[in-house]
Amino acid sequence: MRDETPEQPAPLRFGYTTGSCATATSLAAARLLLTGHADDAVEIVLPKGQRVMMRLEFCRTTADGAEAGTIKDAGDDPDVTHGALIFARVARAAAPGVRFHAGPGVGTVTRAGLTLPVGEPAINPVPRQMMTTHLEALAAEHGYAGGFDVTIGVEGGEALALKTMNPRLGIVGGLSILGTTGIVRPFSCSAYIASIHQGIDVARANGITHIAACTGNASEDAMRAHYQLPDMALIEMGDFAGAVLKHLRRAPVARLSMCGGFGKLSKLAAGHLDLHSRHSSIDLPLLAQWAAEAGASDALQAAMRAANTSQEALKLAQADAVPLGDLVCAHALQVARDIVPPSVAVEMFAIDRQGRFVGAAR
């Protein structure tokens, strides 16, 4: 008899952040600079104390110093930088300390509101600290009293950055060097959530008091047209409604508009803060219950419960003049108001697949 036991999926692989890659390559280049020894791999210590060995693609001298590169391995996470070449060029400096520069494919900060000052290379604080710690320890080990100029680059980074939130955040010319733990956890979506927080922070720092958090391009277009908002005020939240609402607790704005497809908004209305299908589903019986509270007939309720999709349920309700879109927005609005500070004026909008408004609540 055939074994019907499903095969257990292999555990997902963790990977390493661009910050870890930058640390490994800058350490290897600096070691070559001070000792003349070129490594094939280098061990680094991550922020929580783990020691990891990272393989190098090259480690060689240059006209004014040394450089090393590694291929970014994000494990099983769908990271935009997976497979990219991350490299560091290191040169001696007379003054002690480590100074960072943006090489090809690494962006530069041009707007206030991020963790780095305007004009700085987009190398985040934890990667900077990781590199500084390793390079200062190397200098002490070899009795070197000078400092280092460290240039970090990402091959093809300028094109890859167009797939990220960097252009909207005011990071121009390439990617950011990221990471807080040094490790990429598969499908943690931490980088995306961080970009949502950064988007809100940048908007606040630039005097924007009304932001619109949108689930996708259609909802973003609807908000842009409805309010003539600048791009900086449009927050691409995707499925992470909770990331927006919770961040506003510590970084409030005067006014928040949230807009999404009817199905996504119905999940938020039911109390789900992650709107992805992996983490939440559409509750058709709940939609039917809300319709009943608005006077829907028993026949309509039964048809809605039997619907194949939320869009079908919406069309059934619309045909009977039941304002299901407004009802969903009203419930979603209450969920949001329970999270954000009372000082934030919140409103909800739902759109259909053609980008037309099908519900609103204020």
Swiss-Prot record:
State the reactions this protein catalyses.
Answer: Co-precorrin-5B + S-adenosyl-L-methionine = Co-precorrin-6A + S-adenosyl-L-homocysteine
- Pathway where this protein functions: Cofactor biosynthesis; adenosylcobalamin biosynthesis; cob(II)yrinate a,c-diamide from sirohydrochlorin (anaerobic route): step 6/10
Molecular function (GO) terms for this protein are: cobalt-precorrin-5B C1-methyltransferase activity
Please name the SUPFAM superfamilies in this protein's record.
CbiD-like (SSF111342)
Question: Into which EC class is this enzyme placed?
Answer: transferase
Keywords carried by this UniProt record:
Cobalamin biosynthesis, Methyltransferase, S-adenosyl-L-methionine, Transferase
Q: Which GO terms describe its biological process?
A: anaerobic cobalamin biosynthetic process; methylation
InterPro entries, alphabetized: CbiD, CbiD_sf
Return the EC number.
Answer: 2.1.1.195
> What family is it from?
Belongs to the CbiD family.
The entry's protein name is Cobalt-precorrin-5B C(1)-methyltransferase
Q: Which source organism?
A: Burkholderia cenocepacia (strain ATCC BAA-245 / DSM 16553 / LMG 16656 / NCTC 13227 / J2315 / CF5610)
